[in-house]
Amino acid sequence: MELHSLKSTPGSRKEKHRKGRGHAAGKGKQAGKGQSGQRKRSKVRLGFEGGQNPWFRRLPKRGFKNINHIEYQPLSLEALEKHFLENEVVDLEKIYEKRLVTKRTLPVKLLANGKLTKKLTIHVHSASQSAIQAVESLGGKVEVL
């Protein structure tokens, strides 16, 4: 016995049944599609519910996406308190290095969460008014890029 002379066992390999190829073929006429109708002829479009009002028309329109919206990564005063020393300059590279924010693609916004007791010079893309006040009250400086 050699590989080129092997034959499959009779009945182990079934032939594919070709539907819709006449009555004599056994699966002619409706070809397993049921009665004649729209869904027999071809596919129905996406979202079609058989004539019932589809969900995207039943539900009301709501809201919009503001194309001018800027998504910021928050940076809290509490995080700066933990990771930086007195009189240190806090720039974006140091912030990324200490993993206080993760995505380099998004701008960083300083928020007044927590307490700050150190004088720092901070360079960020944006800052809240209360965060700027908290830093400047200690003699620090916030520079918005």
Swiss-Prot record:
Gene Ontology biological process terms in this record: translation
Gene3D superfamilies membership: 3.100.10.10
Keyword set includes Cytoplasm: no
Bias type Polar residues, positions: 1-11
Subunit structure: Part of the 50S ribosomal subunit.
This protein's UniProt keywords: Ribonucleoprotein, Ribosomal protein, RNA-binding, rRNA-binding
One Gene Ontology CC term in the entry: cytosolic large ribosomal subunit
SUPFAM superfamilies: Ribosomal proteins L15p and L18e
MF (Gene Ontology): rRNA binding; structural constituent of ribosome
Annotated region (Disordered), positions in chain: 1-48
Protein name in the entry: Large ribosomal subunit protein uL15
Membership in a protein family: Belongs to the universal ribosomal protein uL15 family.
Protein task: Binds to the 23S rRNA.
Pfam families reported in the protein's UniProt record: Ribosomal_L27A
Biased composition annotated in UniProt, kind: Basic residues: 14-26
